[in-house]
Amino acid sequence: MMRILLFLATNFAVLFVFNIILTLTGIQRQDAVGLLIFATLFGFTGSIISLLMSKSMALRSVNGQVIEQPRNETEHWLLQTVHSQAERAGLPMPTVAIYHSADVNAFATGATKKNSLVAVSTGLLNAMTRDEAEAVLAHEVSHIKSGDMVTMTLLQGVLNTFVIFISRMLAKVVATDRDGNTSQGIYFMISMVLELVFGVLASMIAMWFSRYREFKADAGSAELVGKHKMIAALQRLKTLHEPQEMEGQLAAFAINGKRGGLASLFLSHPPLEKRIEALRNLDSLNGK
């Protein structure tokens, strides 16, 4: 329900901005409607395709090995743990995979709750205790339960639409003279510059939302396995070497992430200290 309300609110915001721009610029409504349709199609197409292909693309990008029949005790434990957590969260069993990497990380992805993936690095399995790894798995299961992959796709689509539409509307105003003639060269250059600038701002918004969802996934893990296990997992991450930021959409749903300075505005994860503090402040889970 919250995801639907968010989507409706963002679409209302698009229409509100659309009408303001028409009023300020004097651009004909039919021209603006055509551009808005183009921006929406272009803005959402890439995000939706990425979502639909996210599971297979993720497995390919990390060379992940899906666990169908456990070959050892670790794989058996992984399947049993994810199955138990998914059952408690009211979810179908996700696909579980392991990928070889020294980086201590895990991620969740997939277009729907019925077609989701939880992948874990060998580095995480080697570096963490079972309790800590259990908390990380619960964090990823919480991402799936909350539908974060779909929510991020909708948000990215709306942001893409805003960037394309506003950039081209403003470029049209600047590139059009008093006689109504538009210089295509000036229009193209200005629209490209504005799309770059607004694209950076849109990335900051998307990453802010991703960091917000990380706090929620941490809380979801605490609800599933107890907050002390999740705190222990995050503290373990603090003691390890600086992790590598995952690429693309995987970064938003991994357990780990980099930090630092102004660059933190573009990171998918909050600082570990803030995540630990937020967990300690979960009064309703003090007994766990």
Curated annotation (Swiss-Prot):
Pfam families: Peptidase_M48. Keywords: Cell inner membrane, Cell membrane, Hydrolase, Membrane, Metal-binding, Metalloprotease, Protease, Transmembrane, Transmembrane helix, Zinc. Zn(2+) binds at residues 139, 143, 214. InterPro entries: HtpX_protease, Pept_M48_protease_HtpX, Peptidase_M48. The chain crosses the membrane at residues 4-24, 33-53, 146-166, 186-206. It is found in: Cell inner membrane. The active site is at 140. Belongs to the peptidase M48B family. This is Protease HtpX. It comes from Histophilus somni (strain 2336).
